Every structure is written in C-alpha cells, then in structure tokens.
Amino acid sequence: LELVDLRYDKAARISDQSFSNYLIKYVFVDQKVIPLSKMIEEGFFINQERTVVACNILLQVFADENVHKYVKEQIDIVWNHLKNSKEKFTPFLKAFYLIRPTETLVLLSDFIESEPARMFDVGTIKFEKNKSEKNIEDDAIKILCGFKATQQTSEAIELLLLYYKKRPDLFYEIYSALAVHFGVDIDSERQGYFVQERVVEQLCKAIESNQTTNLLLLFIRVAAQFLKLSFSR
C-alpha cells in the first residue's frame, strides 16, 4: 500500500501489509495526526483508489466498533461537505454509497424520477447469450448492483425496475444487473436464495402493477438465467 503525504505529495511504499494496516490506524485513528476526514477529502481527488483502500482497511481489517464508528463519522463529514458540488460528489457517492444506504437510494430514486421516459421496443432486440454479462456503464445501475445481499436489496431491485420502465433502452445493462449481479453465485444456497427470490418477487410485483411487453421479456430472460442448474461464480 502506498501512503500519500498530502502536504508534500510524496509517496512511500511499505512492503509489509500488516504493518501498513497498523500504521494507517495509528496515524489516522489512534493519534489523529491528520484528521481522517481531511485525508479522505483531499486524498480522494489525488488518488481515489488508494483512499478507498485505506478506508476499507479501517472498516474491514479492524474488528473494533469504535474504529468503525469513527471512520463512518469522518466519511459523513466529507459527504456533507461535498454533497452540494455535483462534480465532486458524484464520484464520492460512487465510492462510499454504502455508508449512507438509505440516503443513496433516495438520491437514486429522485434521479430516476427526473429521467425522461424513452420509447423503446425491447422486442426488436436480437437477444445474444454472450451479452448476458455485458459490462454495466450506467452509474445508477452500478450503484444499485452494490446493494446485493443487503438490508436494502428489495428497494434496490425495485429501483432497477423503475429505471427500466423509464429507460427500456438499457435492457442489456438492467438484465445483467438482475440476472448476473443479483444472480446465483457460490453464496446463494447458504443464503437460502434470498436475493434471487427478491428479484422474482419484485418482477412479479411490477408485472401485476403494470404489465407491459418490455417487462414480460425481461422477466422471461431473467427467469431463464435463474433456472440454469450451473453457475460460473
């Protein structure tokens, strides 16, 4: 891990990962040599990847409730400071959306609501199986995929379907989100197929509420993927 000296913009590589993890905690949490919120806000726009890695180390490596609480409080400070600047807040939200899951879903709901509806007949698409894991480029869909196996799974799926109603032209990306990212994986059996049940549940609910050809086609494709007996992950 590279620790970045924000003041002088110099980097030092520390080879021992355990010591590196300890040093991050010692500097930013124990001694608070530099306020963690300052490191996050300034470091994020210097080296986003390394800043996120440092925060993840504090949240995931150290099983300390006080550390977790402090880190989340510091991220909240940056969140509040940046949220009125769309240019800076958007990339920050994409990196730290799970710190404020409810607020993130509200923001995405507002975004989807403001999106103009686009007319598109999904039936005109020649479905290609090799596109089932199409790369997702849409930021809203990417973030919603991150809510798999969380307390907000159902809400995230519901928003994906609302987005699909507005943007059927994003069929492949939304199909990929539901069938692949929310699909069967190595943890599904242990979790009682909770995520996949929520996908089917929300699809059925959407169809019952407003049955359209586009929704039916999405349901058919997702169901076909779920009914496969093998999976790759």
Segments (PLM) and residue ranges:
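C-terminal leucine-rich, beta-strand-based interaction scaffolds used for sensing/assembly
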Residues: 1-106, 117
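Amphipathic alpha-helical elements of HEAT/ARM-like alpha-solenoid repeat scaffolds that form extended
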Residues: 46-65, 85-111, 120-162, 169-204, ...
